């Protein structure tokens, strides 16, 4: 390739002959190092430092900042769209919630009518049943009382009458027996007394002879009275009168029947009067008002959530701008320090090259890539053997070439950008649970409003039902209580009247207490049992319509209904929080998923780019390993003639180019040793083909710049450095 074809001399006035720039040279022919501030064709330290502000790392950081700002802008747009969709979804949920919370309003009228009709039918049926029950109880009660009274009173009458008749008969027979026995006894006594009187009288006559006069004994009068002794005729008169006075209890029975039937008939009359005109008042039932829920626009709702996210992204944007811009500015400091060290290192390497370089291409590489070459030299120290050290340096040079480093830096910058976006996305995701919690509270508000309306309606309706219970208990079962009281009073009157009759009949006689005990045993105990039963009826005779539950219109009741209608139903009623949460938070989740997908894609691309760099590294290592165990060659030992010999002749320009010093010596004082760089020349071209030299070895040595196969030659006399646009030509390899 001829450089003169692309850069003619006449068109490059900025590149005169190097020796013509300044005529002053050292005695060895080398141009001295230019003084500070001098004009040079290459960039000096100040020129390099003037370009620090757009170094590669600053540019990469600014590119990362630009990508992050683009991502934040896209996220802001997505959040605005998500806010709009979330508000739309919230409005629909708000409408559904308002409708559900207003459900008691729509259902109350029908339920009130149903309740009123049920109460009317229940009361009418109750009245009819009560009338029939009262009639049945009346007849049963009267029959029971009549059975007891008539049976037991007839028994008492039988017993008393039999006893009276027996007593009168006994008295009559006793009178007859007494009359008969007293007459006979009087006659016998009279006969015995007559003989005794005669004896006594004779004895008295004897006594009288002695001057004492004895009275005569005469018992005719007492004996006559004894003979006439008998029971009085009026002894049975009282018993006959008592027999005639024994009652048949007909009056008691009639009085008792009338007294027993009177309260029952009164109750039946009142029941008939109430049945005919009873109508339940529907207007007393409450009707809940409609509910209009407002939770989408309230404080702490969706607006607050998205405003918080917008503030978060704005803060993140400011932080990224501040951090990355400051980092881009601060990175100029180490880059400036790096340039200064690189400048000093380049100057040091120039002297090092003059002393120790083996290959002009190696010299150019060391000077142009100081850090990569330093890393290669450091890596080469880990191995022994010249060949392996060269291969280690070659691997480092291969993976730190500008294209490879650009590939690596591009991948690292992409990953760093993904990391920045991931931090922002993580901050956004942390706020999503708060939205889920807020949205879950929407359902709680609907549930609370519905429960509140249901509870208010139930309280009002239950109050009406309780008033109806009280009214029925006072009007109907109050009569029942009066009836039971009247029946109890009637029974008491019956007992009292019966006791009075017995008292008037048997009072003061020996039969009063036995008859009273018999009455208590046969009738009194039964009447006491009936009175206890009537008292129990009076205490428990009341109606109690059941109250409505407070959650009649609540979500639990509606949930049960929905489950009964559809066992697989998946509705807002069955799980009010989840559906609302899914419907609104899904919008935010979709945005975060979209951003996360973009970050994942960028991270994959960056990882692929970095993996390509690692693949390049692997290729370099594999290539180096294929040449790792070759034999080392001594310096200048080409192992005979090359298979592809160098050209025998070079043009004048090319020959001149081979004589150009590789660096300009520094300023030295006269008398100091010459430290100019040695001049490199190649071995004389071989004219014969060495059959023992492998073409593959030649190809590999050519790729490595024929390291170790050149002889070092130092010119003894100085010469003036000449500028040349020489042409470099190779027979088999042309580099463009």
From Swiss-Prot:
Localization in the cell: Cell membrane
Q: Which residues lie on this side of the membrane: Cytoplasmic?
A: 78-139, 337-395, 623-736
All ranges on the Extracellular side of the membrane: 1-56, 161-315, 417-601
Instruction: Look up the domain of life of the source.
Output: Eukaryota
Note down the stretches annotated as region Disordered.
Answer: 1-33, 717-736
Q: Which residues cross the membrane?
A: 57-77, 140-160, 316-336, 396-416, 602-622
Q: Establish whether keyword Glycoprotein is in the entry.
A: yes
- Give me the glycosylation sites of this protein: 228, 254, 452, 481, 488, 503, 550, 565
UniProt keywords (A-Z) are:
Cell membrane, Conjugation, Glycoprotein, Membrane, Transmembrane, Transmembrane helix
Just give the chief location class.
Answer: membrane
Tell me, in a sentence or two, what this protein's role is.
Answer: Involved in cell fusion during mating by stabilizing the plasma membrane fusion event.
Protein name stated in the entry? Plasma membrane fusion protein PRM1
């Amino acid at each position: 390739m001829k450089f003169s074809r692309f850069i003619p001399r006449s068109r490059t006035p900025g590149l005169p002959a190097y020796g013509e720039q300044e005529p002053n040279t050292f005695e060895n022919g080398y141009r001295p190092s230019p003084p500070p501030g001098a004009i040079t064709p290459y960039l000096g330290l100040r020129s390099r430092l003037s370009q620090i502000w757009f170094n590669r790392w600053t540019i990469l950081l600014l590119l990362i900042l630009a990508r992050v700002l683009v991502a934040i802008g896209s996220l802001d747009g997505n959040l605005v769209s998500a806010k709009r969709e979330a508000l739309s979804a919230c409005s629909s949920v708000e409408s559904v919630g308002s409708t559900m919370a207003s459900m008691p309003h729509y259902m109350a009228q029908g339920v009130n009518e149903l309740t009123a009709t049920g109460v009317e039918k229940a009361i009418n049926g109750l009245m009819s049943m009560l009338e029939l029950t009262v009639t049945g109880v009346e007849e049963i009660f009267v029959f029971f009382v009549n059975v007891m009274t008539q049976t037991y009173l007839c028994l008492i009458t039988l017993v008393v009458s039999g006893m009276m008749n027996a007593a009168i008969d006994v008295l009559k027979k006793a009178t007859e027996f007494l009359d008969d026995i007293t007459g006979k006894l009087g006659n016998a006594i009279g006969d015995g007394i007559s003989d005794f009187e005669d004896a006594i009288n004779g004895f008295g006559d004897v006594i009288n002879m002695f001057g004492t006069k004895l009275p005569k004994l005469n018992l005719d009068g007492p004996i006559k009275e004894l003979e006439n002794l008998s029971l009085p005729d009026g002894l049975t008169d009282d018993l006959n009168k008592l027999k005639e006075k024994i009652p048949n209890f007909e009056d008691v029975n009639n009085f008792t029947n009338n007294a027993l039937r009177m309260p029952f008939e009164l109750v039946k009359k009142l029941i008939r009067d109430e049945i005919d005109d009873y109508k339940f008042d529907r207007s007393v039932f409450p009707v809940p008002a409609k509910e209009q829920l407002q939770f989408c626009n309230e404080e702490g709702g969706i607006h607050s959530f998205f405003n918080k996210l917008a503030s978060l992204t704005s803060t993140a944007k400011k932080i990224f701008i501040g951090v990355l811009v400051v980092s881009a500015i601060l990175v100029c400091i180490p880059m400036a320090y790096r340039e200064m060290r690189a400048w000093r290192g380049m100057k040091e390497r120039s002297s090092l090259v003059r002393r120790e370089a083996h290959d002009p291409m190696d010299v150019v590489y060391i000077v142009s890539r100081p850090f990569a070459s330093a890393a290669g030299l450091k890596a080469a120290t880990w191995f022994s053997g010249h060949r392996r050290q060269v291969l280690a340096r070659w691997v480092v040079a291969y993976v730190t070439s500008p294209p490879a480093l650009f590939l690596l830096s591009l991948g690292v910058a992409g990953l760093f950008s993904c990391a920045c976006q991931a931090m922002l996305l993580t901050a956004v995701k942390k706020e999503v649970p708060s939205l889920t919690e807020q949205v879950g509270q929407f359902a709680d508000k609907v549930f609370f409003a519905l429960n509140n309306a249901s509870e208010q309606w139930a309280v009002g309706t239950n109050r009406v039902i309780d008033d109806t219970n009280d009214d029925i208990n006072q009007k109907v079962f109050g009569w029942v209580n009066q009836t039971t009281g009247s029946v109890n009073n009637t029974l008491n009157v019956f007992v009292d009247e019966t006791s009075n009759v017995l008292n008037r009949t048997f009072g003061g006689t020996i039969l009063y207490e036995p008859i009273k005990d018999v009455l208590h045993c046969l009738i009194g105990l039964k009447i006491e049992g009936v009175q206890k039963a009537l008292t129990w009826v009076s205490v428990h005779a009341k109606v109690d319509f059941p109250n409505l539950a407070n959650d009649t219109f609540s979500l639990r009741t509606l949930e049960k209904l929905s489950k009964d209608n559809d066992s697989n139903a998946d509705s807002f009623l069955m799980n009010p929080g989840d559906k609302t949460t899914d419907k609104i938070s899904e919008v935010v989740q979709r945005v975060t998923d979209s951003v996360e997908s973009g970050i994942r894609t960028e991270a994959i691309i960056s990882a692929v780019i970095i993996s390509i760099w690692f693949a390049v590294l692997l290729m370099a290592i594999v290539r180096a390993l294929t040449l790792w165990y070759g034999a080392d060659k001594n310096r200048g030992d080409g192992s005979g003639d090359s298979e592809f010999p160098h050209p025998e002749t070079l043009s004048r320009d090319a020959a001149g180019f081979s004589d150009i010093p590789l660096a300009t010596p520094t300023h030295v004082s006269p008398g100091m040793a010459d430290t100019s760089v040695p001049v490199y020349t190649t071995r004389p071209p071989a004219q014969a083909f060495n059959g023992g030299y492998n073409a593959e070895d030649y190809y590999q040595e050519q790729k490595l710049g024929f390291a170790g196969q050149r002889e070092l030659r130092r010119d003894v006399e100085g010469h003036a450095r000449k500028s040349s646009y020489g042409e470099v030509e190779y027979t088999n390899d042309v580099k463009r």
